[in-house]
Design a protein with these regions (language model features):
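Core beta-strand elements of the Rossmann-like FAD/NAD(P) dinucleotide-binding domain
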Residues: 2-3, 154-163
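Glycine-rich FAD pyrophosphate-binding loop
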Residues: 20-43
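A conserved beta-strand/loop element that lines the FAD pocket in flavoprotein oxidoreductases
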Residues: 122-136
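Conserved mid-domain beta->alpha element of the FAD-binding
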Residues: 10-19, 31, 115, 166, ...
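A conserved short coil-to-beta-strand element within the FAD-binding core of flavoproteins
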Residues: 132-146
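C-terminal helical "tail/cap" subdomain of flavin- and related membrane-associated enzymes
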Residues: 315-410, 416-427, 432-437, 444, ...
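Active-site-adjacent segment of FAD-dependent monooxygenases/related oxidoreductases
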Residues: 39-118
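Conserved FAD-binding catalytic core of PHBH/FMO-like flavoproteins
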Residues: 117, 163, 167-268
């Protein structure tokens, strides 16, 4: 075998998955079709959950370096730092239930550089874990592993591993070659976007609906939304001529575009793999689900796929997984992906032209002025409302949810954050000094988890918690006697057999 896990795709999802695998003791090998990393901006930011996940891996400073500039750019481009639902920019971060849990505005190429450096640091300074110019063209699997035929600049080669994960985007070769069902809905709109400083752009109207479509403008960028006229071959590059024609159809203004870059074309077609695992092949990110970019949820969704899968797959391939652990990947992440497809379809419907839809948009806009409605949409788009079903009774409000970056007081009186204790990538039990029974219950698993005796600040409802490697609260206790029966069930569910 050439690796423990072959990861196909060196975008943000593939790089983070490889890093999580390596941190948990597995040997990943990343295959990327492109010879060089993409330089053009695509996604513009990551959500609170992904931001917290990367902070737990020590990447907080790298993210913060991009955040201040990103906030300024967003305010400049949209006139507001608020989030949106179907381009209704009213979701106010300051009004949310947990206003300190925020995302990071970082362009995708910058994020890829951060993650590539992180992966390199985990592989002893070597970049050999990523093979560029390697395109998967055939795939077979049996009970022992997966073998791929790869096209390279030097000809074809065969590589094998016990498991393979497709992180190769919405047109995933892995998904097609492995035979995943990919049901969904056809597109109702197409977005075209280019980066350009063409002098004629000032002749265009301001951003908004034009009667025949939508126009979106920002310094150095212009985009259109049309509700018909899909290109016959969506795989062809977006040219200046196609963009010029689209601008004319949408605005009636003919703008010469002597030079464009960063051309993107995408639709609101929404599809999701029926399962995220077929035998020894798994999917993550856009390979598992595609949808419109409304709400900026796609990259966050994919990164959290990687965070959920990495430790589970590493435990499986290294023989440390409890029974059924890998099956929980689809069980937990598929409903989250389905929920994103659901809300992006709703946003697509609200963007359609016509008086009836315009009336509905006005009503949704009015509803967003109500605090609880604003928070509902904020939870939905951020993913902070996500709660996994746990295979044992767990009644604490945090159980099954992503743990916030708690502030903790140590025995010496110092203050630390939860993320500072999670760098090892192992499960973590934090317990109050007055709940030693929690640490005693975990004693048989001490070789497989980290334990810290701390006091949680600013939360009267939380004294102790078991945190999975992906940041999910597997068990939590309030200030009363710790429920060690449920804690033991949680340890058995997620950690190697004691």
């Amino acid at each position: 075998m050439d690796a423990d896990v072959i990861v196909v795709g060196a975008g943000p999802v593939g790089l983070l998955l490889a890093a999580e695998l390596r941190l948990a003791g597995a040997r990943p090998l990343v295959l990327e079709r492109l010879a060089e990393p993409g330089a053009e901006p695509k996604a513009r930011g990551i959500g609170a959950l992904a931001t917290e996940a990367l902070r737990r891996r020590g990447l907080g400073e790298a993210l913060a370096a991009h955040q201040e500039r990103g906030l300024a750019d967003k305010a400049r481009d949209h006139g507001s730092e608020k989030g949106h639902f179907a381009q209704i920019f009213k979701i106010d971060p300051a009004l949310q239930e947990e206003p300190d849990r925020v995302g990071t505005l970082i362009w995708q190429p910058d994020l890829e550089r951060v993650l590539a450096a992180h992966l390199t640091s985990l592989t002893g300074g070597s970049s050999a874990a990523v093979l560029r110019g390697h395109e998967v063209i055939a795939l077979t699997q049996d009970d022992s592993g997966v073998t791929v035929t790869v096209g390279t600049p030097d000809g074809e080669r065969r590589l094998s591993a016990p498991y393979l994960v497709g992180c190769d985007g919405g047109r995933s070769a892995v998904r097609k070659l492995a035979g995943f069902d990919f049901p969904g809905t056809e597109p109702t709109s197409v977005v075209r976007r280019v980066l350009t400083d063409a002098p004629g752009l000032d002749k265009l109207p301001e951003s908004g609906w034009t009667g025949t479509g939508m126009l979106m403008r920002a310094p150095g960028m212009v985009a259109t939304v049309e509700f018909d006229g899909f290109p016959e071959d969506r795989g062809l590059p977006l040219t200046a001529e196609e963009m010029r024609a689209s601008l004319f159809r949408v605005t009636g203004v003919d703008v010469e575009l002597p030079e464009v870059r960063g051309g993107l074309r995408f639709t609101d077609g929404a599809r999701q793999a029926a399962t995220y695992r077929v035998g020894r092949v798994l999917l993550a990110g856009d390979a598992a689900h595609v949808h419109s970019p409304n709400g900026g949820q796609g990259l966050n969704l994919g990164l959290m796929d990687a965070v959920n899968l990495g430790w589970k797959l590493a435990a499986t391939v290294t023989g440390r997984a409890p029974e059924g652990l890998l099956d929980t990947y689809t069980a937990e992440r598929h409903p989250v992906g389905a929920a994103v497809l659901h809300n992006t379809r709703a946003q697509s419907a609200l963007l359609l032209p016509g008086a009836h839809v315009a009336a509905m948009r006005d009503i949704v806009s009015d509803l967003l002025d109500f605090l609880e409605v604003n928070r509902y949409f904020g939870r939905m788009l951020s993913g902070l409302g996500t709660r996994y079903e746990l295979p044992y009774p767990a009644t604490h409000p945090l159980a099954g949810r992503a743990c916030p970056d708690l502030r903790l007081v140590t025995g010496t009186g110092g203050t630390r954050t939860l993320s500072e204790l999670c760098g090892s990538g192992r499960p973590l039990l934090v317990h109050a000094p007055f709940q030693p029974e929690a640490a005693e219950a975990a004693q048989p698993w001490r070789g497989a988890l980290d334990v810290a005796e701390v006091t949680v600040r600013d939360r009267d409802d939380l004294a102790s918690a078991l945190i999975r490697p992906d940041g999910t609260v597997a068990w939590a206790s309030g200030p009363g006697p710790a429920d060690t029966v449920t804690l033991t069930a949680a340890l058995r569910a997620w950690l190697p057999p004691a």
